[in-house]
């Protein structure tokens, strides 16, 4: 296990298996030394987390949705690097 995986474990973050593309796009693209990750959406319990902060969702719910997206991005990066985030 690498440094980044160890740090994720310390933070209690478990990376989900990256979702398959839901439409006609690829989840990530490697170009030279760069990895471009497609847009990630917050999905919780099989449903999209949507809404306007302060109107239909709370600030805490919005923060959780952003965290879900960030974790999904890291998951895609791990897939792109063949499980080597370091």
Language model features with spans:
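Short, polar/acidic, helix-capping and beta-turn segments at strand->helix junctions
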Residues: 1-86
């Amino acid at each position: 296990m690498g440094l980044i995986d160890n740090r994720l474990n310390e933070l209690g973050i478990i990376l989900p298996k990256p979702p398959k593309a839901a439409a006609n796009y690829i989840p990530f693209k490697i170009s030279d030394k760069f990895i471009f990750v497609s847009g990630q959406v917050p999905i919780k319990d099989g449903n999209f987390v949507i809404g306007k902060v302060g109107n239909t969702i709370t600030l805490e719910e919005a923060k959780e949705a952003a965290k879900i997206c960030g974790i999904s991005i890291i998951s895609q990066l791990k897939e792109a690097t063949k499980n080597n985030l370091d």
